[in-house]
Swiss-Prot record:
Gene3D superfamilies: Cupredoxins - blue copper proteins (2.60.40.420). This is Monocopper oxidase-like protein SKU5. The gene is SKU5. Glycans are attached at N14, N58, N107, N169, N200, N257, N278, N293, N342, N362, N430, N444, N534. Residues 563-587 form a propeptide. It is a lipid-anchor; GPI-anchor. It comes from Arabidopsis thaliana (Mouse-ear cress).
């Protein structure tokens, strides 16, 4: 058999494998510093492939995603995929409890499947307060063509990132926190990495580049909006246009009209917006600070422009007002309660979302997690959950388990707040595999908090002001509470979530408020199948990085501007296909 026939045989074996399996998408990310002026002042920001914000990742349910990351920063790097569940592969989650940092000048390749998910998400760098300097971007998971969607196909799909922003870079902000200081009021709010349109000559400096979204009259667009900021809740609105809420973090919602919606740190929403206004002028897109003294924070407002293709003039006049609820603290909470799961719509699978009857499942574990204002522990300013300020392990949790490294963490996280003095510890929750956990998030701080759980979409069953008690369960929504991965907890209030622990691994449970997270307001939930023949969790990847107690296992990497040497079998298949095509042309 000649070489051509051998290659042809290999080609057909490989092509059969590829088409039988789920397809792959490939991205190369070069993460570096660039100089930009989002608020009119030159500053160092973190870019991906020279872009700020980074490129949008766009994939389809069940695709395998390969992201090769080259770290050109001067410090360690991890990318976290906010809301992507990483089914059975917490090794790819990109936080310190699951991954060793990618050293400067090194390449590392993430490879994971977006299994059984659809929706709107984002990614960001999770170490060293880096998100405050950028490195974030949108992450879109489209449904498969065979799965029905509960609305007509939009005429366009637009991603929007919003977030508070400081002119100081992440290293200066980090030092302020290390020195025990507050960060103070942000310098502004960015929309897609750009500063505000000059709607007011006093509040907005001249010469700032602003975001413009161009649309066609009469068309309907899907706007995917993510709050990628540091700690500020933002009210999102478009002058003169209704926002039809359609999806949030992978769950289709009951479709309702809003003139504006509060989007808290770490949250993502999809809106259907119809361009049904006249084109006498452009329209303002606004993201303004919430749950603060909004008179003082007036300058902390992001303003972009919605421009019809036949627009006759620039936007002018006052911004459209946000909610007038200065003396009504229930308005925002009632709006949040109005967001409900569309139980009849298909999600990533053909069956209706509501076929999972979460309200009838027996709870196996209950955790009441309380955060307080920052405290001083051993002379350092820290934040806590249940009186514990988390210290990240030097060795990732599941890697320590697999390679039998002891004393990395303790499975002793308390189910209720500690009564003694606060302490620093690597204390994590021992989750029961296939258990059903109730978590009550009690915010006894004066600031809004957002909480995120990696690895899962949890069910938001209740929220209210005051202290949670067992009687509060009588108010739970056990039918159509939204399933999502990030939930807000209002100051002096609680939010309750239910989690089906069907995804083995070690999963980060944290505040999304970057300052509080940096100071220790997090833990992990370790979920392990006790069966000795455990086949539910994939082993660590071949390219795993080693650190901490396992540092001696790490081989040096040859510094190169090229991609990783290997990104799996699919790359080999592609090479073989290319060789075969060349041989075919010669024959």
């Amino acid at each position: 058999m000649d070489l051509f026939k051998i290659l042809l045989l290999v080609f057909f074996v490989n092509i059969s494998f590829c088409f039988a399996a789920d397809p792959y998408s490939f991205y190369n990310f070069e993460v570096s510093y660039i100089t930009a002026s989002p608020l009119g002042v030159p500053q160092q920001v973190i870019a991906i492939n020279g872009k700020f914000p980074g490129p949008t990742i766009n994939v389809t349910t069940n695709e395998n995603l390969v992201v090769n990351v080259r770290n050109k920063l001067d410090e360690g790097l991890l990318l976290h995929w906010n809301g992507i569940q990483q089914r059975r592969v917490s090794w790819q989650d990109g936080v310190l409890g699951t991954n060793c940092p990618i050293p400067p000048k090194w390449n590392w390749t993430y490879e994971f499947q977006v299994k059984d998910q659809i929706g709107s998400f984002f990614y960001f760098p999770s170490l060293h307060f880096q998100r405050a300097s950028g490195g974030f971007g949108s992450f879109v998971v489209n449904p498969r063509a065979i799965i029905p969607v509960p609305f007509s196909t939009p005429d366009g799909d637009i991603t929007v990132t919003i977030g508070d922003w400081y002119i100081r870079n992440h290293t200066a902000l980090r030092k302020a926190l290390d020195d025990g200081k507050d960060l103070g009021m942000p310098d502004g709010v960015l929309i897609n990495g750009k500063g505000p349109y000059r709607y007011n000559d006093t509040l907005v400096a001249d010469g700032i580049d602003f975001e413009t979204i161009t649309v066609h009259p009469g068309k309907t667009y899907r706007l995917r909006v993510s709050n990628v900021g540091i700690s500020t809740s933002l009210n999102f609105r478009i002058q003169g246009h209704n926002l039809v809420l359609a999806e949030s973090e992978g769950s289709y919602t009951v479709q309702q009209n809003y003139t504006s919606l509060d989007i808290h740190v770490g949250q993502s929403y999809s809106f259907l917006v119809t361009m049904d206004q006249n084109a006498s002028s452009d329209y303002y897109i606004v993201a303004s600070a919430r749950v603060v003294n909004e008179t003082i924070w007036r300058r902390v407002t992001g303003v972009g422009i919605l421009k019809y293709t036949n627009s006759k003039g620039k936007a002018k006049g006052q911004l459209p007002p946000g909610p007038q609820d200065e003396f009504d603290k229930t308005f925002s909470m009632n709006q949040a309660r109005s967001i409900r799961w569309n139980v009849s719509a298909s999600g990533a699978r053909p069956n209706p979302q509501g076929s999972f009857k979460y309200g009838s499942i027996n709870v196996t574990d209950v955790y009441v997690l309380r955060n307080m204002p920052p405290v001083t522990i051993s002379g350092k300013r820290r934040t806590t959950l249940n009186g514990i300020s988390f210290k990240n392990p030097s060795t990732p949790i599941r890697l320590a388990d697999k390679l039998k490294v002891k004393d990395v963490y303790k499975l002793d996280f308390p189910k209720r707040p500690l009564t003694g003095p606060a302490k620093v510890a690597t204390s994590i929750i021992n989750g029961t595999y296939r258990g059903f956990m109730e978590v009550v998030l009690q915010n006894n701080d004066t600031k809004m908090q957002s909480y995120h759980m990696s690895g899962y979409a949890f069910f938001v069953v209740g929220m209210d002001y005051g202290e949670w008690t067992e009687n509060s369960r009588g108010t739970y929504n056990k039918w159509d509470g939204i399933a999502r991965s990030t939930i807000q907890v209002y100051p002096g209030a609680w939010s309750a979530i239910l989690i089906s622990l069907d995804n083995p691994g070690a999963w980060n449970l944290r505040t999304e408020n970057l300052d509080s997270w940096y100071l220790g307001q997090e833990t992990y939930v370790r979920v392990v199948n006790p069966d000795e023949n455990n086949k539910t969790e994939f082993g660590h990847p071949d390219n795993v990085l080693y650190c901490g107690a396992l540092s001696k296992l790490q081989k040096p990497q040859k510094v190169s501007s090229s991609a990783s040497k290997s990104i799996g079998f699919t790359s080999l298949s592609m090479v073989v296909m290319a060789l075969v095509m060349m041989m075919m042309l010669q024959h």
